[in-house]
């Protein structure tokens, strides 16, 4: 998208320096996998540890330099259709609604945004994307989609323990104790920060299993704890993760628009990466719209 991204100042500041994969055998033991046993799709040579928020802000600035209008804080709430059933655009949510659901004195109705083509990029399980898939039967030839929940924390750690560019992935304990599946990551970013988290498949059998608490248990493992001791958590979050892969992709286009990114399900789970494919899907869709 930006071949000269280094010269243009893209916030990719921490190249991957070491790539490690572990299987946690118990609450105290771990087996580091030999590099030759790690699937090639999990290798990260040439990649960067980034803050996706910083990259998205940088991309937003680049878009605005091209006179693209960005409306942060205004989420699309409804799909607008022409009389012939083709997509006309979207309507943003109403503002100034009280807790009882009634308009208040500062009520402002949502804006209608019309376009020749509307591209939907809501992320995993986007509510408008699901309506479009159902309306146009876009998933009739696709495998059922598969989901997980991803829980993430950002920590500031002791500089003596910080190893910029170290990338760690793994599986095993504690999820294997509850018959659950999933995995974890820990990345050493810039400014003495690490990002860490766990993805748990939503097919877990034990109804009492609590993914958030499983992550808290995981942080007590010596492999993880060694970096966090003396540090502090500075932010956290969670989100749904789409995991069905290539065969679960719906048809991407419909009359008046298309689905891109995780709204369609472009996460490449064999690589545990989706930002690359989300961007590429947007680029391909943009080129198709330009040529239409």
Residue ranges and their predicted role:
Residues 1-29:
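N-terminal FAD cofactor-binding segment of flavoenzymes
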Residues 16-19, 27-28, 46, 59-67, ...:
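Rossmann-like flavin
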Residues 44-52, 108, 140, 270-278:
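Alpha-helix N-cap/helix-initiation motif
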């Amino acid at each position: 998208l930006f071949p000269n991204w280094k010269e243009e100042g893209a916030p990719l500041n921490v190249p991957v320096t070491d790539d490690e994969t572990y299987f946690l055998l118990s609450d105290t033991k771990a087996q580091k996998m030999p590099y030759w046993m790690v699937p090639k799709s999990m290798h990260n040579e040439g990649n960067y540890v980034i803050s996706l928020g910083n990259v998205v802000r940088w991309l937003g600035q680049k878009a605005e330099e091209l006179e693209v209008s960005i409306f942060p804080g205004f989420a699309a709430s409804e799909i607008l259709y022409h009389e012939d059933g083709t997509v006309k655009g979207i309507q943003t949510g109403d503002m100034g609604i009280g807790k009882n659901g009634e308009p208040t004195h500062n009520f402002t109705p949502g804006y209608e945004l019309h376009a020749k083509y509307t591209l939907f990029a809501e992320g995993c399980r986007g509510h408008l994307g699901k309506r479009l898939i159902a309306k146009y039967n876009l998933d009739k030839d696709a495998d059922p989609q598969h989901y997980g929940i991803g829980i993430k924390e950002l920590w500031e750690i002791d500089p003596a323990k910080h190893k910029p560019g170290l990338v760690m992935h793994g599986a095993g304990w504690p999820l294997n104790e509850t018959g659950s599946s999933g995995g974890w990551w820990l990345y050493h970013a810039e400014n003495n920060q690490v990002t860490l988290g766990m993805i748990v498949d939503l097919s877990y059998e034990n109804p009492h299993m609590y993914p958030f608490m499983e992550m808290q248990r995981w942080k007590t493992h010596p492999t993880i704890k060694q970096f966090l001791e003396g540090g502090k958590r500075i932010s956290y979050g969670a989100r749904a993760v789409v995991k069905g892969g290539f065969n679960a992709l719906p048809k991407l286009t419909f009359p008046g628009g298309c689905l891109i990114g995780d709204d369609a399900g472009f996460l490449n789970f064999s690589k545990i990466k989706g930002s690359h494919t989300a961007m590429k899907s947007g680029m391909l869709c943009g080129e198709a719209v330009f040529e239409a």
